[in-house]
């Protein structure tokens, strides 16, 4: 997940373009979404031929790098001759996806704002898009999230960026995960998805949740800005990625939020 932008290139009043399902199983896939890169690589090693510079998992991923999520190298992607390009409406920009389509490449655009949407889109990408069998890790992830115990509810500030300060707002995947873990973020009703916030005017909260991505908050960089609030440092990958890490996310995040 790169630095957040409060935009929805394929949402709102603009309808999603057709979501292609290939007539045959793709043999060459390029992923422009770190979460989905990991999902495809773990499920079908060798299927991916290209991924962004931000695609850090699996650690041993050996594919051609094609630039960033917000500035992919369209000629480099085209040169790889992929059967399918996987994208996301929040991670990637409309002009880049339009350029890929103009080059004749099929682009599958995902839309994930909640855990149920993540599970649905993962199956669509892997099974419908890539022609793969439903992976066991996806079943394990769904089971892990179904098995959550009820927790006392707490209110939290959840920054995602510093300089300027930005936080989780409405309609976010990370916010949905936290809510399922008993944490209600204080800007959930904000008009923006990633609003800028004034630390001098914070709503009442029980804690501050500080992920290590997209901004890398640490014990020495973040908690000091919220005196009097307990700080929970959490794995940004487990909070914001929708892929194999979802199977362990309830345990990892739950432990950090205690």
Language model features with spans:
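N-terminal ligand-binding lobe of clamshell/alpha-beta domains
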Residues: 2-258
């Amino acid at each position: 997940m790169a630095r957040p932008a409060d935009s929805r290139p394929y949402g709102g009043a603009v309808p999603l373009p057709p979501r292609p399902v290939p007539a045959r199983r793709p043999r060459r896939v390029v992923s422009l979404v770190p979460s989905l890169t990991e999902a495809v690589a773990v499920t079908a090693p060798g299927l991916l031929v290209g991924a962004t510079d931000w695609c850090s998992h699996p650690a041993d991923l050996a594919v051609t790098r094609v630039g960033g999520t917000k500035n992919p190298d369209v000629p480099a992607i085209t040169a790889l001759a992929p059967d399918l390009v996987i994208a996301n409406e929040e991670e990637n920009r409309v002009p880049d996806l339009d350029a890929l389509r103009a080059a004749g490449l099929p682009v599958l655009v995902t839309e994930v704002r909640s855990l149920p949407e993540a599970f649905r889109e993962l199956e669509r990408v892997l099974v419908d898009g890539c022609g793969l069998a439903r992976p066991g890790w996806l079943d394990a992830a769904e089971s892990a999230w179904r098995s959550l115990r009820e927790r006392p509810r707490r209110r939290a500030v959840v920054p995602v960026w510093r300089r300027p300060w930005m936080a989780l707002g409405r309609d976010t995947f990370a916010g949905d995960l936290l809510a399922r873990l008993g944490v209600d973020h204080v800007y959930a009703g904000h008009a923006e998805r990633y609003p800028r916030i004034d630390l001098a005017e914070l709503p009442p909260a029980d804690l501050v949740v500080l992920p290590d991505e997209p901004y890398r908050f640490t014990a020495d960089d973040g908690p000091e800005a919220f005196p009097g609030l307990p700080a929970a440092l959490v794995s940004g990958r487990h909070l914001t990625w929708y892929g194999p890490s979802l199977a362990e996310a309830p345990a990892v995040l739950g432990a950090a939020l205690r």
